[in-house]
């Protein structure tokens, strides 16, 4: 009896784009042979808003409220790099108290960023319960931000050239220490619930392995780089703000798989708590803003045919003049190296404002990681990268 041969042709599957509040508007064109992934092509750009061009047509004070829309899980990091760029270009010093306040806000944002990564990542691999836990803890961080800045999730508009917009209110530091005490126990609870769970371990161990050489060659940063055994943290390398005043460790893992990246992020939350405790205990007195940096310099005069005269019908507002020159500034966000290349032309607006988003670079390795894996592993690998499409597309 003759048997019919079965031939299977590759199937092309579109994953996404989804709503920005979910996994984001990332579209993956996946080529499948049965359950195996042959090829993957990421399609980006659905959330492009021209942030760099907007920055080149705004003064720094006007642009700071915009920047929370890059990475809407890490608004404080975006504000920090936006004011750090002209600060470094113009050599504007920051008072010690303002630097401590900035560090506290950045580390709170690092915890909030890792929490918002942790919940959806675990939901993707089948653990639904922690997804609800993380919002309970993030709510307390929102309360602290609301007390200090007036806003909760994004658009805090708190960082300024030379300092911060306002000093911390009375009793805020005590509330922050109370949060650290509360959250320390919650991280222990997460680890008991998740880390040694056999189902979770089988879903993420040995999946999406990135070697040390691959991580360096693909220019990865943040937990993606440290999860492959590279001890590289810009808080230690660049010595920005006042991180050298505190005792903390750079967390690494050697395996390079999804589980290693999970462990790095969970342990980084513990290190952030250590930094916040030390900053709250040792914060000095003094001004929260460099008053010399507030000096106003009038911009160029309006021409009758110029766009500012025709459409705004007033002269350019007095504000900081960005001196001529160019500079690259970077910091360690929750996702990796967030950088800005700024080029000034002795005007109130930068001539060039290039944003180096960490998740844009980290996303490049996804097609290589997905080749040969099963369909069920796609979300585990993509989730371990920690991508926010507002930051990728800008």
UniProtKB/Swiss-Prot annotation:
As its record notes, the protein acts as a catalyst of: a plastoquinone + NADH + (n+1) H(+)(in) = a plastoquinol + NAD(+) + n H(+)(out); a plastoquinone + NADPH + (n+1) H(+)(in) = a plastoquinol + NADP(+) + n H(+)(out)
Return one Gene Ontology term, BP aspect: photosynthesis, light reaction
Q: Which GO terms describe its cellular component?
A: plasma membrane-derived thylakoid membrane
Q: Which GO terms describe its molecular function?
A: NAD binding; oxidoreductase activity, acting on NAD(P)H, quinone or similar compound as acceptor; quinone binding
Please classify the protein's predominant subcellular localization into one broad category: membrane
Q: EC number(s) on record?
A: 7.1.1.-
Q: Where in the cell is it found?
A: Cellular thylakoid membrane
Q: How does it sit in the membrane?
A: Peripheral membrane protein
Where exactly are the transmembrane stretches of this chain? none
Q: The organism sits in which domain of life? A: Bacteria
| Cited HAMAP family | NDH1_NuoD
**Family statement:** Belongs to the complex I 49 kDa subunit family.
Q: State whether it acts alone or in a complex, and with which partners, per the record.
A: NDH-1 can be composed of about 15 different subunits; different subcomplexes with different compositions have been identified which probably have different functions.
Q: Sorted alphabetically, which PANTHER family does this protein's record hold?
A: NADH DEHYDROGENASE [UBIQUINONE] IRON-SULFUR PROTEIN 2, MITOCHONDRIAL, NADH-UBIQUINONE OXIDOREDUCTASE 49 KDA SUBUNIT
Protein task:
NDH-1 shuttles electrons from an unknown electron donor, via FMN and iron-sulfur (Fe-S) centers, to quinones in the respiratory and/or the photosynthetic chain. The immediate electron acceptor for the enzyme in this species is believed to be plastoquinone. Couples the redox reaction to proton translocation, and thus conserves the redox energy in a proton gradient. Cyanobacterial NDH-1 also plays a role in inorganic carbon-concentration.
- Write the protein's name: NAD(P)H-quinone oxidoreductase subunit H
Q: Which organism is it from?
A: Synechococcus elongatus (strain ATCC 33912 / PCC 7942 / FACHB-805)
* Gene that specifies this protein: ndhH
